[in-house]
Amino acid sequence: MQDISKSIEACAARYGEQATAMRDYLVAGQDAALALDNRGPIEFDASGKLAQHILDAYSKYGFYVFTGVLTEEECEDIEADMVALKASFPVAPDSTVDAEGRPALGSDSLTPHLVWSKPLGDPLGGTQLANGRHQVKMFEPQATADTPTASPFILLGSLRFSDACLRTYAHPELLRVAEAINGEDFAPFNEALFIKEPGIGAAVSWHQDGVTHWDSPDFDENIHGFNFMAQLYGSTAVNGVWVLPGSHKLGKIDIKDLVSSSKSERIEGAVPLVCDRGDVVICNRQALHGSFPNSGFEPRLTVNFGFHKRSSVLRVKGGGIHSDAQVFDDEIIARRSRVLGYAIAARKERFPEETAYEYKPFTKRSLSFVWDDAARADIHDYNRDDLSI
């Protein structure tokens, strides 16, 4: 694990009179996270099923840290793509050109792609954005004078922009985990990159991701799906996501009341997702989670992608957060799933020694995919069909 003692001090120092409380919270949270029994490599039993102790821990806590999933080679591929992506970012939120005057990344998009924030800000908390699910505003520390006025902290539709992220999306062991949790006909959700630069990265206020099924008669702990969070530089108590263990089973939570009872945004019992480079977290979308502004010295780059049970999205009207609200029929789900087919093909080309994942809905329809220029054109604005619930 990374030594983040200097980052803890730097972060706490920005909280003024609450510095000691913040320092204690970060240290205690890190210790509590590492004491949980929900960390280790992906394991399957003799019959090929996901190990029962992983299923049990995921059900108990609402998240599990899979260690050492991405090889150094794969991490380096993502890193190289990130250098190119950042160079192509627009120079400002309302700009269509990059620093070299070229058309900026996503300038021809019909869908949202970059979410911006002021340094160390909380652009979502306490607003009606994302259906108002970010109920409270996080503390926004004062950034230093040399930081930009705004910077991107989320890239949506990331598989279109990064071949390396597309290939990670098709990681065979992760897809086997998705099948174990959501069934062999699991459906895609949404993909994004979360960019938390040191001294700049924005907060994401406490929230639960699900919006559609809270009052469903079929409600269960997995009805809103999950996200995989692959960590390029690791994840810490300072720059990482915090989760309230077990909260995925509690239904819709009154976050304002919880913050009030905790007497601050430092929610009691929450723990950070502590990860090393190449680790991947599976996190239930119903779990209460959020992150503080990155006031430390370590960057975080999270390759985020999620999956649903097909029964959670088929003939269901979407929540309208990641895409326009629409009723998801078989055609829409199939159209949105084609990105997975291209991802499997792209990964097979890059890592031919691996046994590629077999996605049963493709097999049943005798579908095959090739990753080429035509495929690249086919996934332009693919996230218009994000299965957002």
Spans of features found by a protein language model:
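Acidic, His- and aromatic-enriched active-site or binding-groove loops in soluble protein domains
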Residues: 205-225
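Short, structured patches in soluble enzyme cores that scaffold and shape functional sites
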Residues: 192, 197, 208-210, 230-234, ...
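Short helix-to-loop capping/linker segments positioned immediately adjacent to catalytic or ligand/cofactor-binding
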Residues: 163-166, 177, 214-218, 230-232, ...
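Short, surface-exposed loop/helix-turn segments at secondary-structure junctions
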Residues: 136-139, 208-211, 256-269, 299, ...
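A structural signal for short, well-ordered beta-strand segments
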Residues: 190-193, 228-230, 303-307
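Non-heme Fe(II)-dependent double-stranded beta-helix
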Residues: 2-60, 67-206, 212
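Double-stranded beta-helix
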Residues: 222-226, 233-292, 312
